[in-house]
Amino acid sequence: MADQLSEEQISEFKEAFSLFDKDGDGTITTKELGTVMRSLGQNPSQAELEDMINEVDADGNGTIDFPEFLTMMARKMRDTDSEEEIKEAFKVFDKDGNGYISAAELRHVMTNLGEKLTDSEVDEMIREADVDGDGQINYEEFVKMMLSK
């Protein structure tokens, strides 16, 4: 399954994996998964976290290693994001609920994820998604960006 991913996707997923793998030991634990999900405004129970890990934990050791993470991401991409998941993700970024993601909101979420971005990196991310050029990302632009990934 993971062999259907491009080099670029694999390197993006490596970056995402390292955001989750807080202690850098090459595995994601329920604790690390919980930390990232809470920083995204979710509040999973211990049982939910264990279920999420067990879903992709091929070798049954209670953690997710990078190959298991790739399999999970490949599966998720195949099931392409449902409208509902995209709406939820948009809400995570759109802190003030005004229907737009500003540079400040984007920076805030990325910082919570442990990604320290420069202003120019944030501006670049906004520019890439900002079809109408108003300096923010609206829902339609967000959907387009999510589906083009």
UniProtKB/Swiss-Prot annotation:
N-acetylalanine modification, residue list: A2
Binding-site positions, Ca(2+) 4: D130, D132, D134, Q136, E141
Annotated Ca(2+) 3 binding sites: D94, D96, N98, Y100, E105
Residues of the site described as Not N6-methylated: K116
InterPro entries named among the record's database cross-references: CALM/Myosin/TropC-like (IPR050230), EF-hand-dom_pair (IPR011992), EF_Hand_1_Ca_BS (IPR018247), EF_hand_dom (IPR002048)
GO cellular component, one term: myosin II complex
Glycyl lysine isopeptide (Lys-Gly) (interchain with G-Cter in ubiquitin) crosslink site(s): K22
Sorted UniProt keywords: Acetylation, Calcium, Isopeptide bond, Metal-binding, Repeat, Ubl conjugation
Name of the molecule in the record: Calmodulin
Source organism (scientific name): Agaricus bisporus
